[in-house]
Every structure is written in C-alpha cells, then in structure tokens.
Amino acid sequence: MDIIFYHPTFDTQWWIEALRKAIPQARVRAWKSGDNVSADYALVWHPPVEMLAGRDLKAVFALGAGVDSILSKLQAHPEMLKPSVPLFRLEDTGMGEQMQEYAVSQVLHWFRRFDDYRIQQNSSHWQPLPEYHREDFTIGILGAGVLGSKVAQSLQTWRFPLRCWSRTRKSWPGVQSFAGREELSAFLSQCRVLINLLPNTPETVGIINQQLLEKLPDGAYLLNLARGVHVVEDDLLAALDSGKVKGAMLDVFNREPLPPESPLWQHPRVTITPHVAAITRPAEAVDYISRTIAQLEKGERVCGQVDRARGY
C-alpha cells in the first residue's frame, strides 16, 4: 500500500512517521512536483492539480473539516480527480470538542453581558446592567452537520432554547428543527444568537447578508465559525452600526489573513480570532485516517465521505 502526503504548512516529517507507525504495511512518502509514481491513497490540503490528476486512487483524504478548496479546484480542473475516487474529510478529529469550547464560551460571554461591561470599562464607567433571561436567549445553529450537532449538545447543558436550520430536517432531542429556504425566515425570527456552521457551497456563499440579518431580532449576536465567504462583511458592518446586530465574533473571513485596513479590526462590537476555532489535531487525525483506510481495505462502509454534488 502506497500513501502520498501533501500539506503546505504541516510538519510533513512528523506526519509521515506517525502514519508509518499507525499503518505499518504502508509505504508513506511526501509528494513533490514531478512525482508520478502510483499510489493508493492521497492525504492532502490545497493540493496541486498534478498531484492527483490521472491517478487510480482508492481514496483521497482532505486534512481538514472542509473540502471547498479541493472542490473549487476540481470545478476548474475536472481532470484532477476521477469521479470514481471517494473523497473524505476529517469529520470530527477533535474539532467538535474545540467548536464546543469556542461556542459555549462566547455564548456565555454575551449572555452575561461581558461585552457591554468591557465597553463600560473602557470609559471607566461603573453601572450594573439588567440580566438577560435564558428563555429569551434562543440560540440558532445555521448548518446542522456533525459539528453543528456537537455544538447543540454542549449548549443544551446550559438550558438555552435551541433551534437549527439545514437543507433537510433533523431529529435532535431538545432542538427545534427548520429545513429549506421556505423555513429560514421563521428560524431566524427568534435567534438572539446565530451560530454559523454551514458548509461552503455555491448555495451558501453570501447567505449572511442584509436580507438575512434584517430577519433576526433587534440586538442579535453573530458567531461565524464556518467560512468567511458566508458573510457579506459590508452588510454585517452596517447591521452592527445600526444596532440591529449587537455583536459579532468572527473566526473566518473573505480574505485571510484579514487585511490591516479592514474596518472589522477596529469595530467596538467585533471580536476577531485568526481561524483557530477548530484546528486539525494531528494525532487524532492520523488515528481517524488509519482506521478509515483499514475499513476501506476490508470493503466496509465508512463515514465522512463527501458528496461532491452537495459540496460536503
């Protein structure tokens, strides 16, 4: 069994050694331009077209939760990956836990009004504020996949009203489910906090725009943990300036790194993190990949395969 590996920033040698230990029967090598030697599996992130083009692979593994970088390149270069080759993503290799930590900490930050107290502190102003009530602090999760499910589970502990929206209806205990564009307005109407965990597809690009934000209750909060392309940043800034949106926590952006001249940096109601909400944990990723390859070699059914038509 031959495995090729490519990631522009990961510690390649660590990965190769870890994969060799986890899959002793495999010959693992770092792919370099000009390497056309056959392989069975490819582990990639932002792969060059020539790495995958023409190969008879058993599977390709994207080294992250998203596959939009591969699918967008595949649209421009359909020869890059044969239709018969299954594409897998890291469905949850510690990312669910990280998303839970991030989402819960920020929801509680807003619920206890720490953002307001920080603004008061900046002007040396001492003033206790009225508390928010749980029953009025509905949290909506936009995108109901594996990570959305994990976030919902963690928030249930805090007894907030929860709802989710996705392409198809879900049956999550304690979570009100909305499905399809025809139910999006009803979903948004009660969301004091909107958590975005949508996949990046042509249908979801720019979905968080003026029209969507206007359907939220006044003074709502936005937590974007998915992709920057989901948010029309000028529309969000306008909603923040008007008070329609009271605060935004943003981990992802249309351009990354976020340019220094972006007005998001200086906005008093925006908090920024540099795309760190859920990063790939190498040891857990290697464990998932090795187990999945073992299942594929046995002809077993496995989870995490991407539907290329849907984009996730």
Curated annotation (Swiss-Prot):
Any Gene Ontology CC annotation: cytosol
Sample GO molecular function, one term: hydroxypyruvate reductase (NADPH) activity
Major location category of this protein: cytoplasm
Record has NADP as a keyword: yes
Pfam families: 2-Hacid_dh_C
PROSITE patterns: D_2_HYDROXYACID_DH_3
Keyword Oxidoreductase on entry: yes
The reaction(s) this protein catalyses: glycolate + NADP(+) = glyoxylate + NADPH + H(+); (R)-glycerate + NAD(+) = 3-hydroxypyruvate + NADH + H(+); (R)-glycerate + NADP(+) = 3-hydroxypyruvate + NADPH + H(+)
Domain of life: Bacteria
Cell compartment(s), UniProt: Cytoplasm
Annotated EC: 1.1.1.79, 1.1.1.81
Entry annotation: catalytic residues: 227, 275
Enzyme class, first EC level, given as a word: oxidoreductase
Keywords: Cytoplasm, NAD, NADP, Oxidoreductase
General function of this protein: Catalyzes the NADPH-dependent reduction of glyoxylate and hydroxypyruvate into glycolate and glycerate, respectively.
Family note: Belongs to the D-isomer specific 2-hydroxyacid dehydrogenase family. GhrA subfamily.
Name of the molecule in the record: Glyoxylate/hydroxypyruvate reductase A
Organism the protein comes from: Escherichia coli (strain SMS-3-5 / SECEC)
Gene: ghrA
